[in-house]
Swiss-Prot record:
The name this protein goes by in its record: Cytochrome P450 monooxygenase ptmG
Top EC category: oxidoreductase
UniProt GO BP: mycotoxin biosynthetic process
Cofactor section: heme
Function: Cytochrome P450 monooxygenase; part of the gene cluster that mediates the biosynthesis of the indole diterpenes penitrems. The geranylgeranyl diphosphate (GGPP) synthase ptmG catalyzes the first step in penitrem biosynthesis via conversion of farnesyl pyrophosphate and isopentyl pyrophosphate into geranylgeranyl pyrophosphate (GGPP). Condensation of indole-3-glycerol phosphate with GGPP by the prenyl transferase ptmC then forms 3-geranylgeranylindole (3-GGI).
Record keywords: Glycoprotein, Heme, Iron, Membrane, Metal-binding, Monooxygenase, Oxidoreductase, Transmembrane, Transmembrane helix
UniProt EC number: 1.-.-.-
Bilayer topology annotation: Multi-pass membrane protein
One Gene Ontology term, aspect cellular component: membrane
SUPFAM superfamilies: Cytochrome P450
Organism: Penicillium ochrochloron
Length: 540
């Protein structure tokens, strides 16, 4: 029987309402099941932490509440590992403790025991946790990440495997020192104009210049007013911070890739130019590339067979380009260390006086005598024992942060207890390890004398490890120490430095730098605001 038209509209309306209700009910069921599953999963993860050494733990929210409470008292951009170390101090946590930050991260085990750190890195040779350095892509090409994923890469690599030694770097010291004349002139100009400058930026340019000299054997003009190198470098690295935010990365990535390609093109062109200029094919200005070219011309790299006597193979050129990008970016992490060294020396004038006395006795008391000494006897840097100790103490107090490793095995033993660490992130916490009072008495004090030969209390084995050890160690540590020594030697003879933060600037804990607290607002850990400073010429 046909439905009268007068009843058609109400029936249609009723049918639509029933359809919507049914669809809504159908959607509620999987959503409810998903919520139940998530709650069960979170509860299961949280229960795994029940009997583990850890800070106060919320039954459902894990360690998010305790970290957020700590963060509320700190500057928003403070370096995250410092927050963890403050929690460790507050609750007097042992050298092995666990953090529950699921679902953002897998369970994390923090380690600040030197023996256990040695076992994980040097005995078990645990690899770095996946994705740690990939955040620097595209500034560093993916080719480099594939290279360092090979456990034996340092042996076959066409640069690192050839001449990456302290003895080779010392030969480059005279040219490195000469390249810093422009920096000294700039500091002199800022002193005349009473201008405040960013120490971290100056240190970055200085290390970029010295690393370029070591790699290419040529001056990069990093202190020129419109330097191609510093412009390309900053354009390729500045987006790193914004790209750490997964919501911003898609918007940043296209322009970042474009700037990275420009940076790589500048490096590639310089590599080719260096090869073309290497006229005698073996000898000449000491550099990492010159040593590599000498082996390449003898067909000494099976992974990169020579195409012809006068040309670079495409694969070899790309390997040298990606290596150059990685070395230049990695080396500039030392800019934060040298910046903190200037800050600490300003805060400890007696140590600064001792340091200048050492510089004068070993190399001379003015710029010209120092440059002449380094030209004739670059190994004099090895006689700067207190300078070396100052840098080691600075690295102890302000390391680059924890090293994240893959689980070397399913379990870990410590002090008679066995821990299940399957699917854990293993974090060797330098910030905690370097400030243990049983390893470094009065650990928050700046005391470089503890690192001098014959110190009353020797440093325990494997307790000082800012460059790490085993797989993933910093291959450039010898070069970094040489560069920082050269910079201290040339600047402290002529200039005094003092921090110039605004009164309203954010301030972190004094033990972590105060106004110059460490932030995560750079390629690596960086002093807040880049450490603004004023420079004054020393009274003779």
């Amino acid at each position: 029987m046909a439905i009268p038209k007068t009843m058609e509209a109400p029936f249609t309306h009723l049918f639509l309402n029933l359809t919507v209700m049914t669809l809504g009910q159908i959607l509620v069921i999987p959503v409810a099941l998903l919520v139940v599953y998530i709650c069960i999963r979170i509860g299961s993860i949280r229960r795994q932490f029940r009997d583990l050494p850890k800070p106060p733990h919320h039954a459902f929210l894990g360690h998010f509440p305790i970290l957020l409470r700590e963060l509320r008292t700190l500057p928003r951009d403070i370096f995250a590992p410092l927050v963890v170390d403050l929690v460790r101090r507050k609750f007097d946590l042992p050298a092995v403790f666990f953090l529950d930050l699921y679902p953002l991260f897998n369970p994390i085990v923090f380690i600040s025991d030197p023996g256990l750190a040695r076992k994980i890195t040097q005995e078990d040779r645990s690899l770095r946790y996946p994705g740690v350095f990939e955040t620097l892509y595209p500034a560093i090409p993916t080719r480099w990440f594939r290279t360092v994923a090979d456990r034996a890469w340092t042996k076959w690599h066409p640069v690192v495997g050839v001449s990456f030694t302290a003895a080779h770097f010392v030969r480059m010291v005279p040219q490195m020192a000469e390249d810093l004349r422009a920096m000294l002139d700039q500091l002199n100009d800022w002193s005349d104009r009473d201008e405040i400058f960013c120490m971290e930026r100056v240190a970055t340019d200085a290390i970029l210049a010295m690393t370029g000299r070591a790699y290419f054997g040529m001056e990069l003009d990093c202190f020129a007013p419109k330097s191609q190198w510093t412009s390309a470098f900053r354009a390729a690295t500045t987006p790193v911070v914004a790209a750490r935010n997964p919501l911003r990365k898609p918007f940043v990535l296209p322009s970042w890739k474009r700037h990275a390609r420009t940076f790589h093109a500048v490096i590639r062109e310089k590599v080719q130019h260096t090869f073309d200029k290497d006229e005698n094919h073996e000898a000449g200005v000491p550099s990492l590339l010159a040593s590599s070219f000498a082996v390449y011309r003898k067909n000494g790299f099976p992974e990169f067979p020579r195409v012809s006597q006068e040309a670079l193979s495409t694969e070899y050129l790309e390997e040298l380009t990606s290596t150059g990008a990685a070395f230049l970016i990695g080396a500039t992490s030392g800019a934060s260390v040298i910046s903190y060294a200037f800050l600490l020396l300003h805060q400890h004038p007696n140590i600064l006086d001792d340091l200048r006395r050492e510089h004068g006795q070993v190399c001379g008391f003015n710029r010209q005598s120092i440059l002449l000494a380094l030209q004739s006897r670059p190994r004099l840097l090895n006689d700067l024992k207190l300078t070396h100790a100052v840098l080691k103490e600075t690295l102890r107090l302000f390391p680059m942060g924890p090293v994240l490793r893959k689980c070397p095995s399913e379990t870990m033993e410590y002090e008679g207890r066995t821990y299940d660490i399957r699917n854990h992130i293993v974090a060797i916490s330098h910030n905690s390890l370097h400030r243990r009072p049983d390893l470094f008495p009065n650990p928050d004090a700046f005391n470089p004398y503890r690192f001098l030969p014959g110190a009353a209390i020797p440093i325990p084995a494997d307790a000082w490890r800012p460059f790490e050890k085993g797989n993933g160690y910093c291959v450039g540590q010898e070069l970094a120490m040489i560069q920082m020594k050269v910079m201290l030697l040339l600047t402290l003879t002529e200039f005094d430095f003092q921090p110039k933060y605004a009164r309203e600037a954010a301030r972190g804990p004094d033990i972590y730098g105060g106004y110059a607290y460490t932030t995560g607002s750079g390629i690596g850990p960086t002093p807040a605001g880049g450490l603004p400073m004023r420079v004054d010429k020393r009274m003779k």
